[in-house]
Design a protein with these regions (language model features):
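Conserved small/polar residues in nucleotide/adenosyl-binding loops
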Residues: 1-5, 182-190
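N-terminal small-domain helix-loop-helix segment of the aminotransferase-like
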Residues: 8-11
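S-adenosylmethionine/decaboxylated-SAM
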Residues: 13-182, 186
Length: 193
């Protein structure tokens, strides 16, 4: 796969800066990224890590592993980046960390399946960011029966909007970035009583 043939798969400069700012605000100890691609967003997210923090990045494309590693090694975050190669839906359940920040930018067809798996790894008060949730505006128009990706993103957006344990907003940046704060409503109610 040629990288220049996949422009929508890479976070642009503005989105990269936003990811960095969000990460710096949160000051996470543990970040999980689903969908590494070139590693650009990995490096942007790493800018906010606390000292000794770690970012786990998962990608299924083994052809890009060495490409990513080359740039990670040149960065000041090399020791903080842990690469995982494989199907994210199989890799994530093997992780036992409660993540402060999760960034989802992977296979759109599986966005709905990722939701519960990712929430189980997100600590209360953690933030879930999801890329491409406007999907070039297709989520706002009638959807072709054959358009599986758009259907999946619409379903994902609906699932997020129906959850009472999350505060959700879609930012109209590039192709849409959902920002979710996992409040775990029941935990807050228990603390108030």
């Amino acid at each position: 796969m040629c990288i220049r043939d996949r422009p929508r798969m890479i976070s642009g400069a503005h989105q990269g800066r936003l990811l960095s700012i969000i990460s710096k605000i949160i000051s996470p100890t543990k970040i999980l990224e689903i969908g590494t691609f070139t590693g650009y967003s990995t490096l942007c997210l790493s800018e906010g890590l606390t000292k000794g923090g770690r970012i786990h990045t998962v990608d299924i494309n083994e052809e890009l592993y060495d490409f990513q590693r080359k740039y990670f090694k040149k960065s000041p975050f090399n020791d903080n980046i842990i690469q995982h190669l494989g199907n994210a839906l199989e890799v994530i359940p093997t992780m036992d960390n409660n993540f402060d920040l999760i960034f989802l930018d992977a296979d759109k067809n599986n966005y709905p399946e990722y939701l519960d798996v990712l929430i189980s790894k997100l600590k209360i008060g953690g933030v879930l960011l999801s890329d491409n949730v406007l999907w070039d505006g297709k989520v706002l128009n009638p959807i072709s029966e054959k358009d599986i990706s758009t259907k999946a993103i619409v379903k994902y957006n609906k699932l997020l909007s129906q959850r009472e344990d999350m505060d959700t907003v879609i930012l109209p940046i590039r192709d849409g970035l959902t920002t979710v704060s996992y409040t775990h409503l029941r935990a807050h109610e228990t603390r108030l009583n």
